Amino acid sequence: MGFHFCIWIIFLLPPPCKKCLSPPTMNLRPPKSCGNVFYWVLVLNSGLLYKFCQTIKCRANWRPARAPRGWNEATERHQERRTQMETEMGGISTTYWHRLCTCTDRRAEKLVMDGNNCWFHK
């Protein structure tokens, strides 16, 4: 949805007048002959493009810390069960948990320091 939405927004831009296409100056506002409508449509579209096309909002969840490399999933599960049993019986081993932020499509993953949501830049 995001990619098609970006293209759709780009085509919503009205064609600029020739004065608007002049080289940029220190003045950020366009000439009055171009009208304020074009300026605000441009600002709105750039904001929407940034929000919908550049970032993904993801939810943070608590997950057990990953095992060292070289372990397969079966060994990792067995170790987690053993650690949990030792903890319940009063052993010194504990399972450490990370707060990970994973997108629904599993493209990106990172540790979350605070809050429940995090943003990924594509």
From Swiss-Prot:
Signal peptide per UniProt: 1-20
Keyword set, alphabetical order: Secreted, Signal
Subcellular compartments: Secreted
GO cellular component: extracellular region
Highest taxon of the lineage: Eukaryota
Name listed for the protein in its UniProt record: Putative uncharacterized protein PKD1L1-AS1
Organism encoding this protein: Homo sapiens
Lineage, top ranks: Eukaryota, Metazoa, Chordata, Craniata, Vertebrata
